[in-house]
């Protein structure tokens, strides 16, 4: 499970990461996406990078079709815009029939994991028991979003998220097995499959008769997908391709019968006659012959899931098994990987829910110094912070699933944020649970140490969080950069763009005089949350001011300012989280939910601290010379360590 390798040009490459994720929001031939929980084959580590897309001054002079204004809150916040279409009010997307169907599923699935599945045994055996797999098949768990007419349950993204949450509460090893199968294993068939491909393969995978796996990562390719070496050469007759190569760290690799495989294919340019290699996606069956696998990998966590190397030796793949178009494999891979990021947040929200229950139980029953430890301030703060992190993660997960079900097309930044936030929140919550439980938490019997081992991979799955932070910042800056390019073009023709220039001048004047942007969430958030709403608006203004200043300073060079980009991404994550919880808590207050006042406290607490972080971080980036000194020190210290082969300092005893 390799971490992404960072190269000097990674910033420019990242401008493509996720650019197509939103366009896969609806599955072909069925209602909206199957963004099945991303539970999550190791090969997703790659964050899938494409050839660089640069911000070219020439590009701004070419005629381009008008693009609809994005409804994404995340896109808007980089521009200093308060775009509320996708975040307010907190969406309710299930109709009565869907809600009833979900209720009928939740009970049996929860009981199965409580009464039948044994996560400790799965971990010890390093596999999911056959009886458990059979039970999951009977529940329909292998085809949750496959259309019902093809043997699946045909769930929406929101319905899927709820079941992903239940699985995450109980066993992340099983989650990975299920997710590697349907979230990425056969997801490409759902997104890009022809009618014939769907009819041939989906009934088999939906029933669990055949497991699926996603084969992308190779020893030479981590984040740089273009460096894969597996090849698929078309036969002279054009009826098949001969596939050769190997893939590493493939979840379900030793169990699967159907594989989504990515390989380079030679493609002749019709105009020039030149032959270039481009990535193409294929549906490959083990029964084709020439498909073998290695021994299961020994891993830190998610031991119950099968992870192995897969080899393809002269495999004859029928031409009709090309997935999507020849040469479009990168697009297929990006959409598969990006399509289900929200599912990780839903899964880990469930994991946190279960872990928090263990922490609360221990704090409630443990007596020290003559009192229950839940009465001690240190423990109270830990529990409260754990609850806040779970609330934010869960709110993001269901916001995103609803956005997808509603048919919104632009949510890739939000999806990346949910993955980053959820995976880091789950790690913190589990770590704090162990701390609250003390020595008992470190023991094997309570099962928290297993969850900690399992959770560590989620900061690597789906693209490492480091890579995704760069994507969040660069994608947002790219959208803002286009706006600034438009302003520059307007200055070339001031008489024809009076309105645009007056608006920009007015905005700059308000910022300089401290008047503010005039943005407000008044009338949008519940009145009881007005103070937190004001904090969110102020944070947005501070964030957007720094984004614009840094873009003006660095221009295209911002792609190489990774210290800066990381901190902008952290601000974006905090800000999106503020708005999401404001939306959810507002709905709870408006509807009079029994938990409304508790949710208000969770929301206010998050907003107070997030606003403080944004204010301090943005002020530091904007005007603190010590920040630049710190960045220079990081570069120099790191360089010295690399040159020295490790630490530069010696033991203080000099012995």
UniProtKB/Swiss-Prot annotation:
Biased composition (Basic and acidic residues): 60-70
Transit peptide: 1-40
Cell location: Mitochondrion inner membrane
Keyword line: Acetylation, FAD, Fatty acid metabolism, Flavoprotein, Lipid metabolism, Membrane, Mitochondrion, Mitochondrion inner membrane, Oxidoreductase, Phosphoprotein, S-nitrosylation, Transit peptide
An example Gene Ontology CC term for this record: mitochondrial nucleoid
Renumbered residue ranges of the record's region Membrane-anchoring: 483-516
Cofactor(s) demanded: FAD
Post-translational modification summary for this protein: S-nitrosylation at Cys-237 in liver improves catalytic efficiency.
Catalytic function, reaction form: a very-long-chain 2,3-saturated fatty acyl-CoA + oxidized [electron-transfer flavoprotein] + H(+) = a very-long-chain (2E)-enoyl-CoA + reduced [electron-transfer flavoprotein]; dodecanoyl-CoA + oxidized [electron-transfer flavoprotein] + H(+) = (2E)-dodecenoyl-CoA + reduced [electron-transfer flavoprotein]; tetradecanoyl-CoA + oxidized [electron-transfer flavoprotein] + H(+) = (2E)-tetradecenoyl-CoA + reduced [electron-transfer flavoprotein]; oxidized [electron-transfer flavoprotein] + hexadecanoyl-CoA + H(+) = (2E)-hexadecenoyl-CoA + reduced [electron-transfer flavoprotein]
Modified residues (N6-succinyllysine): 71, 127, 195, 239, 268, 276, 278, 331, 372, 482, 556, 639
Membrane topology designation: Peripheral membrane protein
EC main group: oxidoreductase
Tissue-level expression: Widely expressed (at protein level).
N6-acetyllysine, modified sites: 51, 71, 127, 239, 276, 278, 298, 316, 331, 482, 550, 556
Modified residues (S-nitrosocysteine): 237
Region (Disordered), start-end ranges: 1-70
Polar residues compositional bias, start-end: 21-37
UniProt xrefs under PROSITE patterns: ACYL_COA_DH_1, ACYL_COA_DH_2
Residues holding FAD: 214-223, 249-251, 464-466, 562
Binding residues annotated for substrate, in chain numbering: 461-463
Subunit composition and interactions: Homodimer. Homodimerizes after import into the mitochondrion.
Similarity section: Belongs to the acyl-CoA dehydrogenase family.
Database matches in PANTHER family: ACYL-COA DEHYDROGENASE, VERY LONG-CHAIN SPECIFIC ACYL-COA DEHYDROGENASE, MITOCHONDRIAL
Protein name: Very long-chain specific acyl-CoA dehydrogenase, mitochondrial
Species of the source: Rattus norvegicus (Rat)
